[in-house]
């Protein structure tokens, strides 16, 4: 068996891991590193064209953004992900099957669990030719919003663990306190706070954290964020009960064009990539 780290090691973005066996080969994730000189994974045409499977841990661009490129380079295998992840992708692979319906071929073992990063996010344990590998994906045991199936007792010959924030000396609790302190400085002055967040993931966690701190302050969001709030209220597979109960009395409002007085506001684009969102951020900063 050969394992190749084709991206995502020593860099943030283009997560991609190739496993080649005697009878088949597969990828775990195929991410894009936006703005880089080489944004795509380090894969040769032969490696791509002989792939049998692609397993996706979740929908974020640094794990799935190179999917169109992969198919352009000749990938003709089958992509697998949770049903929730497949529903979140901008463009689904030509051959995509949800893991809930996947029966591995003889010689391949695939187990998976929820990784606590966002709705649909998972880790994998894959067995091939007498060896097993654990791929954690973006994994956390401390999410306020999402459920995690712990990997602590999973045994494998090789573990590929996400550690993007490994060098960060602060704990999650410390960073949350810093965020609340910064938000409080604005809210106590009757100023609104704008949070650019990914379409799927930390937005709901921030909404819960901030609502618990200031239950009287209204929450605003763009159309996508409002849809995520509705989804969270009814989902029992990926979200924690604390999230559903904590946000059960919240009636989020559509985000207005101008900053409301003392509001908690969400837009579903962490990079503020449109002129309209840049202008909105300037109005909040003014």
Q: Which role fits each region the language model picked out?
A:
Residues 1-55, 60-218, 236, 241-244:
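His/Asp/Glu-rich metal-coordinating catalytic cores
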Residues 30, 197-200, 222-224, 266-272:
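Structural motif
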Residues 116-118, 232-286:
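A contiguous, basic/glycine-rich beta-loop/short-helix subdomain that forms a polymer-engagement track
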Residues 218-238:
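Cysteine-dependent PTP/DSP-like catalytic domain, specifically the C-terminal lobe
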């Amino acid at each position: 068996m050969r394992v190749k780290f084709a991206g995502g090691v020593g860099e943030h973005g283009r997560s991609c891991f190739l496993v080649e066996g005697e009878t088949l080969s597969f990828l775990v994730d195929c991410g894009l590193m936006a703005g880089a000189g080489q944004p795509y994974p380090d894969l040769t045409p032969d490696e791509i064209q002989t792939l049998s499977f692609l397993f996706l841990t979740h929908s974020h661009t640094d794990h799935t953004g190179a999917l169109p490129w992969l198919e352009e380079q000749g990938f003709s295998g089958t992509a697998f992900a949770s049903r929730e992840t497949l529903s979140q992708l901008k463009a689904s692979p030509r051959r995509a099957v949800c893991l809930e319906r996947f029966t591995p071929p003889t010689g391949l073992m695939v187990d998976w669990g929820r990784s606590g990063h966002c709705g649909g996010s998972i880790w994998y344990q894959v067995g091939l030719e007498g060896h097993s590998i654990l791929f954690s994906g973006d994994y956390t045991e401390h999410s306020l919003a999402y459920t995690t199936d712990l990997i602590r007792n999973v045994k494998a010959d090789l573990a590929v663990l996400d550690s993007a924030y490994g060098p960060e000396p602060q704990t999650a609790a410390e960073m949350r306190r810093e965020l609340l302190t910064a938000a409080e400085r604005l809210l106590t002055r009757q100023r609104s706070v704008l949070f650019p967040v990914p379409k799927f993931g930390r937005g709901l966690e921030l909404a819960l954290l901030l609502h618990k701190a200031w239950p009287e302050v209204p929450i605003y969001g763009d159309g996508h964020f409002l849809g995520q709030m509705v989804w969270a209220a009814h989902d029992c597979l990926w979200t924690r009960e604390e999230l559903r109960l904590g946000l059960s009395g919240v009636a989020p409002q559509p985000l207005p064009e101008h900053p409301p007085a003392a509001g908690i506001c969400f837009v579903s684009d962490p990079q503020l990539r449109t002129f309209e969102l840049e202008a909105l951020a300037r109005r909040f900063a003014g």
